[in-house]
């Protein structure tokens, strides 16, 4: 195939469906939201004051035709989702088992989500496999 007929390289796609500048902005906003959540968690009720179906009644019965803005999604988390949670990291939550939430763990999950490695065997993720082998031998 000649160079004239060669497909032209496409620029790298944006990060998912979001521009990098938006990712940075909303990433910072969510980190701040999470930090505020943990800073003020002791002021929240451990258990939500609701009955089965209360949240469902506030959610749309059909999927949206178009995606919502991150501003609206974060507002929905703040207004609808967080108040409907059992707050396992609350200092007065003593049921089931101890929570394993930690700042370093959350940041580690963020890295894990960004790498999106499927660590099922060495070929799919040499770093994950070898790191796991070392840590398990400790």
Outline where the language-model segments fall:
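N-terminal entrance/gating region of PLP-dependent enzymes' catalytic architecture
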Residues: 2-138
